[in-house]
Curated annotation (Swiss-Prot):
Cell compartment(s), UniProt: Cytoplasm
InterPro entries associated with the record: Integrase-like_N, TACO1_YebC-like_2nd/3rd_dom, TACO1_YebC_N, Transcrip_reg_TACO1-like, Transcrip_reg_TACO1-like_dom3, YebC-like
Protein name: Probable transcriptional regulatory protein PFL_4766
This protein's GO CC annotations: cytosol
Amino acid sequence: MAGHSKWANIKHRKERQDAKRGKIFTKWIRELTVAARQGGGDPNSNPRLRLALDKALGANMSRDIIDRAIARGTGAAGSDDVVELTYEGYGPNGVAVMVECMTDNRNRTAAAVRHAFSKCGGNLGTDGSVAYLFERKGQITFAEGVDEDALMEAAMEADADDVVSNEDGSIDVFTSFAGFYGVRNALEAAGFTAADAEIVMLPTTSAELDLEGAEKVLKLIDMLEDLDDVQNVYSNADIPESVAEQLG
């Protein structure tokens, strides 16, 4: 059941980039607003809002900012016209890429995403062109030092899909999309405190890259992540550790 995550280096790199660019607040303000609009402003009855709230608090966002974002979503602070969009395409070396956005201007966002693909040697595709290569999953991460055997037993009892040990000592518990909140709550009840928890798009197949290919694909991912309207970028790029070390 346990294994090594091929995409851990991409995830950790993305986290560094998010923090570096200061996009964290903008990202979670949008997520709070959309989650509240879709499921209401009470995090106790809105799991998506609860997750966004936890993320925002973890990023040291003030309660005042959080409350205003939720109020916009529920209409208590005026209307909000932000919509969720997903773009799909192929990057260099045939790497499949999915781009999740939140925007108040579809045309602006589509043009910016299309430009990034074109500039970096990729092609923006149509809906469904690469989505079949990904599965929406829950990912619950525990820091180094957690009792792996006990965590694995608790995860199996909670009907988790997989438990993965990473090279940095952390452990990821993967769940179905529908079972994410149930597994997360069960593990918390069993005494395990997660370092992170999120809904992700995991590739079902991977495209292994050499150094040149990795540099091209990461250039595209960087350009996409720099766009103001982009929330998340997922790919099926598999960058071996030997190549990742050369990237720095």
